[in-house]
Curated annotation (Swiss-Prot):
Catalyzes the attachment of tyrosine to tRNA(Tyr) in a two-step reaction: tyrosine is first activated by ATP to form Tyr-AMP and then transferred to the acceptor end of tRNA(Tyr). ATP binds at K230. It catalyses: tRNA(Tyr) + L-tyrosine + ATP = L-tyrosyl-tRNA(Tyr) + AMP + diphosphate + H(+). L-tyrosine binds at Y35, Y167, Q171. PANTHER family: TYROSINE--TRNA LIGASE, MITOCHONDRIAL, TYROSYL-TRNA SYNTHETASE. Keywords: Aminoacyl-tRNA synthetase, ATP-binding, Cytoplasm, Ligase, Nucleotide-binding, Protein biosynthesis, RNA-binding. The gene is tyrS. Its main location: cytoplasm. HAMAP family: Tyr_tRNA_synth_type1 (MF_02006). SUPFAM superfamilies: Alpha-L RNA-binding motif, Nucleotidylyl transferase. It is found in: Cytoplasm. GO terms for molecular function: ATP binding; RNA binding; tyrosine-tRNA ligase activity. This is Tyrosine--tRNA ligase. Residues 341-405 form the S4 RNA-binding domain.
Length: 406
């Protein structure tokens, strides 16, 4: 197997390939152009999107040429893959703004200065003539075959709109256009994209005669059953305005022990020998590996300086010392404080809990601290006098901490 593919396989990235042997031979012979696509369905990507872009970084390190494809066009349709119901149709203005923010996020992670492209499929999809598209592209698609793919089989029971049914044709056309424009030979995506990717490979092969390939990656899950990319605060976004760098660091710092080695392989560039060494211990000794994991992935997404700040803040929060300023904070407006504010109301306002009942349960269980002092009264109130130097420290359990600032 080709060296680049061996690296991906060893680190747990490979799931399915349209023809692994032929792809390996091609990659031994030349540096290929490959692409990863992502739709602009929200203002930020989350860590569930990171896996294909980690693969992109690995292949780029081996000299292969990446294309980041942002789905400014396909987002107008909505991918039914992995969805139980039709996606909400977004306004064009919202899609355009999402394209800008997602592009900015990815360019902080993927350096294209030495080769590579970032493209928006709206460039060729927005101007399509529907009749011509059906004649030039639709002719290569079998409805029977499309319905055999799991994406469509699942949705047929609950309803599949015609607009979503067109999505596979558009994604396949993307591959055809990238093959024609940039000599792209490989599409990479999550395993839920297998049907779309196979259809794209087939379209390129039949319409242009070019030999291209598709590669899918496993959908990553956590050993505790929680969905990858979800936390108590919701999605773990890559945008620091939506999910702080500190919380991003802490998400990886606090993963289950059983996931440490797997995530070190997936989310860092550490060598195999080092991963095996630091992940071979158990219990409290594994905390060092978790800190390394958290630092490395935070460095990839947010940069080394921000990773250092997050690491320093985490140590300051739980051991005392410098770094307090890097702990996330919530700005409490004086109008909310008035004479005083109930702690349970403050916890909801600061979004550390989702409801007052959850706040009360945490207080009753002894898991809430104000300036390192446990609070045992559900009716505990805070007033201006509590905010020494204009702030207090709110701690929930051992792992969640927030500065409340006036």
């Amino acid at each position: 197997m080709n060296l680049s593919l061996k690296v991906l396989d060893k680190r747990g990235f490979l799931k399915q390939c349209t023809n692994l042997e032929e792809l390996s031979t091609l990659m031994d012979r030349e540096k290929i152009v490959f692409y990863v696509g992502v739709d602009a369905t929200s203002a930020s990507l989350h860590i569930g999107h990171l896996i294909p872009f980690m693969v992109m970084l690995h292949l780029q390190r081996q000299g292969h040429i990446p294309i980041i494809l942002i789905g400014g066009g396909t987002t107008k349709i909505g991918d039914p893959s992995g969805k139980d119901s039709m996606r909400k149709i977004l306004l064009k203005e919202d899609i355009d703004e999402n394209v800008k923010t997602i592009s900015s996020q990815l360019l902080k992670i993927i350096d294209l200065s030495n080769g590579g492209y970032i493209l928006n499929n709206a460039e060729w999809l927005d101007g399509i003539n529907y009749i011509e598209f059906l004649r030039e592209v639709g002719i290569y698609f079998s409805v029977n075959r499309m319905l055999s793919f799991e994406t469509y089989k699942r949705r047929l029971k609950d309803g599949l709109s015609f607009i979503e049914f067109n999505y596979q044709l558009l994604q396949s056309y993307d591959f055809y256009m990238l093959s024609r424009m940039k000599n792209c030979k490989l599409q990479i995506g999550g395993d839920d994209q297998w049907g779309n990717i196979v259809s794209g490979v087939d379209l390129v092969n039949r319409k242009s005669g070019n030999k291209v390939f598709g590669l899918t990656l496993p959908l990553i899950t956590r050993s505790d059953g929680n969905k990858m990319g979800k936390s108590e605060k919701g999605a773990v976004y890559l945008d620091s305005e939506l999910y702080s760098v500190y919380d991003f660091y802490q998400y990886f710092r606090n993963i289950p022990d059983l996931d440490v080695k797997k995530f070190l392989y997936l989310f860092t560039f550490l060598e195999e020998e080092e991963i095996e060494r630091i992940a071979s211990v158990k219990g409290q000794l594994l905390n060092n590996a978790k800190e390394i994991l958290a630092f490395e992935i935070t460095k990839i997404v947010h940069g080394k300086d921000e990773a250092l700040k997050a690491s320093s803040a985490a140590k300051a929060a739980f051991k005392g010392g410098d770094g307090r300023a890097d702990i996330p904070f919530f700005k409490l407006e004086l109008t909310n404080l008035e004479e005083s504010i109930l702690l349970v109301d403050l916890m909801v306002l600061a979004k550390v809990v989702s409801s007052k009942s959850e706040a009360r349960r945490l207080i009753d269980s002894g898991g809430v601290y104000i300036d390192k002092v446990r609070v045992g009264d559900q009716n505990y109130c805070l007033c201006k006098d509590n905010f020494i130097n204009g702030e207090i420290e709110l701690k929930i359990g051992k792992k969640k901490i927030l500065r409340i600032v006036l």
